[in-house]
């Protein structure tokens, strides 16, 4: 029997089953199908307009839109198609009002109809079943209110447990999601451990990861997820743990991760360690941007040794609460990236937002990067002893200070494949020697002897920027004016056949902040 010979009732049911992905192509295939499916087309267009790009309402004290995950769960229960239309989910409320959100959550959950709707979703969830979770217990936990004398369940980062439960349920319902911005409360996600609250949440997150990873481009939730976008401002006091992103890292469709303010440091004090959760799995990440983060060499090692396809990595260092990474081991940080991503990385940026102490070891060689075309580096990443020297600088219990004149020439550091180089004089540091940046720059561009041959045949651009450090502009130019002295042949720039561009061009992280509207506190 031909399709158009089917009874109208059956054809109507077939059209309904094409929602949302295939409706447009099917409905427009012929007049008969379009005529039967006219109401579906109208509903489809309304759903696309309303739900393709979902974000919480941020307009203060209004009753327009949704401000809590509980409200969205109720809407999805009443109209399950909503979940299939959401392709971008922005759960971050930048003008977050915790008291207002708490009142709204309470109002939603005090309504018996809403409670029944959320309970219905929980009861239908095969994710909860596979995680051996009791839907009734989840509903009770989501309705829990912290009383006087109760201990917060989220350790030292506040109590947003029930909101994170609701968000996790949302993450089980979004098969067509492409871009995700996590909510404010995600920083309160408990670290994975054996405590009942942590096991309760992470058991479901593990099922989400497994289903999305094993069933790409299927109806599994998050199986089409491609980008994780920033969900926090850069802050000294507030810290997002890199482990919060563990559920998304192994999902094969996730190729881009742009995040801010994450910590991956095991210092036994104020750091938050990062451990790769999904043993035996690797990430399919291609592009990774870590803005205003606080990660040591061990933390970055634990991450990048599981990213075999990474082509772009950009990192800016930011000291966190109580001086976490006050001194930073830049040399071993870059060496770890080189060891694990040297054969794939094409673009690398390592810059410094804030450094109250010293660079413990400096970058002395990047020869292990086999495909690196573009590099953007803060001048200070070179201002320390080589990682293999056994020497370390530090402001705490360490009197050693590296002789900046021993910083290798830039030509000895860069790999043969390099095409573009951007170096930045930082706008502010805590180092007692205010001239250390300029001394480092002078060492990097010192003269070469006539007999020496440079090994960067494809280099076409060398850029030296001073960002907001305008006071350094004249000093930077003087360094290159000295090198441009015609009485000194074979200077580095002549050998490279390029002239340095000296401007106030923005660093990658400044562009990042503008693009994603990220602020510093």
What are these regions (language model features)?
Residues 91-95, 182-187, 229-236, 258-265, ...:
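Concave beta-strand-loop units of leucine-rich repeat
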Residues 235, 242, 250-256, 260-312, ...:
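Beta-propeller domains
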Residues 76, 342-521:
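Leucine-rich solenoid repeat modules
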Residues 2-266, 520-521:
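N-terminal adaptor/linker regions at the entrance to substrate-recognition repeat cores
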Residues 121-139, 143-147, 263-272, 317-327, ...:
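Acidic/polar low-complexity surface segments
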Residues 11, 39-42, 67-78, 81-88, 161-170, 173-179, 192-227, ...:
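Leucine-rich repeat
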């Amino acid at each position: 029997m031909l399709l158009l010979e089917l009874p109208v009732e059956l054809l109507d049911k077939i059209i309904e089953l094409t929602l949302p992905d295939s409706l447009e192509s099917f409905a427009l295939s012929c007049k008969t199908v379009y005529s039967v499916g006219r109401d579906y087309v109208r509903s489809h267009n309304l759903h696309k307009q309303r739900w393709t790009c979902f974000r919480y309402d941020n307009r203060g004290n209004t009753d327009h839109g949704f401000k809590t995950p509980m409200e969205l769960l109720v809407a999805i229960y009443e109209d399950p198609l909503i979940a299939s239309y959401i392709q971008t989910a922005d759960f971050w409320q930048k003008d977050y009002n915790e008291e207002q959100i708490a009142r709204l959550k309470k109002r939603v959950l005090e309504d018996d109809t809403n409670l029944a709707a959320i309970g219905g979703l929980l009861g239908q969830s095969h994710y909860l079943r596979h995680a051996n979770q009791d839907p009734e217990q989840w509903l009770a936990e989501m309705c829990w209110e912290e009383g006087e004398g109760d201990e917060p369940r989220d350790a030292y980062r506040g109590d947003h447990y029930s909101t994170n439960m609701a968000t996790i349920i949302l993450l089980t319902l979004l098969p067509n999601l492409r871009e995700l911005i996590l909510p404010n409360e995600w920083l309160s996600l408990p670290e994975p451990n054996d405590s009942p609250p942590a096991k309760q949440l992470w058991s479901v997150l593990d099922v989400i990861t497994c289903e999305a990873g094993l069933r790409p481009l299927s109806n599994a939730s998050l199986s089409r997820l491609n980008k994780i976008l920033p969900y926090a401002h850069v802050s000294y006091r507030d810290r997002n743990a890199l482990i919060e992103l563990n559920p998304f890292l192994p999902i094969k469709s996730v190729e881009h991760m742009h995040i801010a303010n994450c910590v991956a440091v095991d210092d036994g004090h104020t750091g938050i360690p990062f451990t790769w959760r999904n043993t035996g799995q690797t990430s399919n990440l291609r592009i990774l941007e870590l803005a205003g983060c606080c990660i040591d060499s061990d933390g970055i090692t634990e991450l990048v040794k599981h990213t075999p396809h990474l082509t772009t990595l950009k990192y800016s260092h930011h000291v966190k609460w109580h001086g976490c990474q006050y001194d930073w081991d830049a040399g071993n940080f870059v060496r770890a990236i080189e060891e694990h991503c040297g054969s794939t990385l094409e673009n690398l940026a390592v810059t410094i937002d804030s450094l109250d102490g010293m660079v413990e070891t400096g970058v002395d060689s990047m020869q292990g990067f086999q495909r690196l075309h573009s590099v953007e580096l803060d001048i200070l990443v070179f201002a320390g002893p080589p990682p293999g020297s056994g020497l370390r600088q530090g402001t705490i219990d360490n009197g050693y200070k590296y002789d900046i004149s021993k910083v290798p020439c830039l030509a000895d550091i860069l790999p043969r494949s390099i095409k573009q180089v951007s170096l930045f004089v930082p706008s502010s540091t805590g180092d007692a020697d205010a001239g250390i940046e300029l001394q480092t720059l002078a060492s990097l561009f010192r003269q070469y002897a006539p007999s020496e041959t440079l090994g960067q045949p494809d280099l076409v651009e060398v850029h030296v920027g001073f960002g907001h450090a305008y006071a350094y502009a004249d000093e930077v130019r003087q360094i290159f004016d000295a090198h441009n002295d015609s009485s000194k042949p074979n200077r580095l720039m002549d050998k490279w056949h390029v002239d340095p561009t000296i401007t106030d061009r923005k660093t990658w992280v400044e562009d990042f902040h503008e693009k994603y509207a990220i602020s510093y506190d």
